[in-house]
């Protein structure tokens, strides 16, 4: 999977696609996924860690 930078609404949309029905844990105050996917590029595998 290609790594990509995803920020804000793009990141949320990508999480919806990756996690599907199970949903995901997104808390902008806990910057984990933002640091992993916005400041640095991340892969789908890294995003899956944030699914519920």
UniProtKB/Swiss-Prot annotation:
<feature type="disulfide bond" description="Interchain (between B and A chains)">
    <location>
        <begin position="19"/>
        <end position="51"/>
    </location>
</feature>
<comment type="similarity">
    <text>Belongs to the insulin family.</text>
</comment>
<keyword id="KW-0372">Hormone</keyword>
<comment type="subunit">
    <text>Heterodimer of a B chain and an A chain linked by two disulfide bonds.</text>
</comment>
<comment type="function">
    <text>Insulin decreases blood glucose concentration. It increases cell permeability to monosaccharides, amino acids and fatty acids. It accelerates glycolysis, the pentose phosphate cycle, and glycogen synthesis in liver.</text>
</comment>
<dbReference type="InterPro" id="IPR016179">
    <property type="entry name" value="Insulin-like"/>
</dbReference>
<keyword id="KW-0119">Carbohydrate metabolism</keyword>
<keyword id="KW-0964">Secreted</keyword>
<dbReference type="GO" id="GO:0006006">
    <property type="term" value="P:glucose metabolic process"/>
</dbReference>
<dbReference type="InterPro" id="IPR036438">
    <property type="entry name" value="Insulin-like_sf"/>
</dbReference>
<keyword id="KW-1015">Disulfide bond</keyword>
<dbReference type="GO" id="GO:0005179">
    <property type="term" value="F:hormone activity"/>
</dbReference>
<dbReference type="InterPro" id="IPR004825">
    <property type="entry name" value="Insulin"/>
</dbReference>
<keyword id="KW-0313">Glucose metabolism</keyword>
<dbReference type="InterPro" id="IPR022353">
    <property type="entry name" value="Insulin_CS"/>
</dbReference>
<dbReference type="InterPro" id="IPR022352">
    <property type="entry name" value="Insulin_family"/>
</dbReference>
<feature type="disulfide bond" description="Interchain (between B and A chains)">
    <location>
        <begin position="7"/>
        <end position="38"/>
    </location>
</feature>
<dbReference type="Pfam" id="PF00049">
    <property type="entry name" value="Insulin"/>
</dbReference>
<feature type="disulfide bond">
    <location>
        <begin position="37"/>
        <end position="42"/>
    </location>
</feature>
<dbReference type="GO" id="GO:0005615">
    <property type="term" value="C:extracellular space"/>
</dbReference>
<protein>
    <recommendedName>
        <fullName>Insulin</fullName>
    </recommendedName>
</protein>
